Amino acid sequence: MKAKRIVFKVGTSSLTNADGSLSRAKVKEITRQLALLHEAGHELILVSSGAIAAGFSSLGFKKRPTKVADKQASAAVGQGLLLEEYTTNLLLKQIISAQILLTQDDFADKRRYKNAHQALSVLLNRGAIPIINENDTVAIEELKVGDNDTLSAQVAAMVQADLLVLLTDVDGLYTANPSTNPDARRLEKIEKISSELIDMAGGAGTSNGTGGMLTKIKAATLATMSGVPVYICSSLKSDALLEAAEESKDGSLFLAQEKGLKTQKQWLAFYAKSQGEIYVDQGAADALRNNGKSLLVSGLVSVLGSFAYQDTVTVYEDGSGAILGKGRVRFGKSSLKDMLKSNKPKGVVIHRDDWISLTPELNDLFAEF
């Protein structure tokens, strides 16, 4: 099998006992399979939940806490204990692991994004296995990624992985809930993530974690748009990681877009915060939507918000109000207003290289980014 750069995401339900505590046996089994893949030449990243599960009992909690402060304290204790389990097991196989804790700001801030990418690249090139989790102890709501499905997709896109594997307690995406509907059918291959597919995914996860199938669809959307295929499978089957690396037929495979978004386009689509709104006429909307053109001053109808040079704005079609996309402007709001007063306004407001087209469905799906 060809060596791949693979990002594995392991959820809380795949790491815990029935009482919600960390299962050392499950961690050991995961590291055994990681070691075999590492020895086969694969570059591996593990995005692992489980910090709260590993730490809450040490603080005297009888069960997994629900209050934010209690969960953050449990994560602070558990993160070290969880990493110790991974590190000890991997060292027995002469494999170095590294801990990286991230927040949403590490993706939204271009400088920090670059630093994280460089650190991961060095670790992979040196044969280490980075073990990543969200920094639950310090992350405030505005900086939270929210779930490790999304975090793993962000990491996979960042490092341009060959495959993202989401390990869970179900063996893929079904047409209905397989536990309640005997006619539910597993989808083995998904070529396009449609709005119907998103609706079908619904919500609902397990009590020990935060992610349901809908978060996995969101993660798959982000990754496949960035050129990374996604495989959802069950961690409960033996050799689940080994089989997932070969994309066996025991899960659901989401095919990557042929032309995945480059780093700049990823940042615009998923992380750049919009500072204003621009409304354009139908001609400009058609040029942006269908012809791959830049946005010219002559196509502007109105500008709203407070934005400066190089800020990101959202562009809509005037009249219909339909979202067209986001881009980085070459003029601030005041300059654009002055230019619009001219009889023949000229200039490029957003160059095509600084533009990403968005559908309403995609905009809604990633609204919290």
UniProtKB/Swiss-Prot annotation:
Sites where the protein binds substrate: 49, 136, 148
Chief site of localization: cytoplasm
GO biological process: L-proline biosynthetic process
Keyword Nucleotide-binding attributed: yes
Chain residues that bind ATP: 9, 168-169, 210-216
S-S pairs: none
Pathway stated in the Swiss-Prot or TrEMBL entry: Amino-acid biosynthesis; L-proline biosynthesis; L-glutamate 5-semialdehyde from L-glutamate: step 1/2
Catalytic activity as recorded in UniProt: L-glutamate + ATP = L-glutamyl 5-phosphate + ADP
InterPro entries membership: AceGlu_kinase-like_sf, Asp/Glu/Uridylate_kinase, G5K_ProB, Glu/AcGlu_kinase, Glu_5kinase, Glu_5kinase/COase_Synthase, Glutamate_5-kinase_CS, PUA
CDD domains: AAK_G5K_ProB, PUA_G5K
Family: Belongs to the glutamate 5-kinase family.
Name the UniProt record assigns to this protein: Glutamate 5-kinase
Protein's organism: Streptococcus sanguinis (strain SK36)
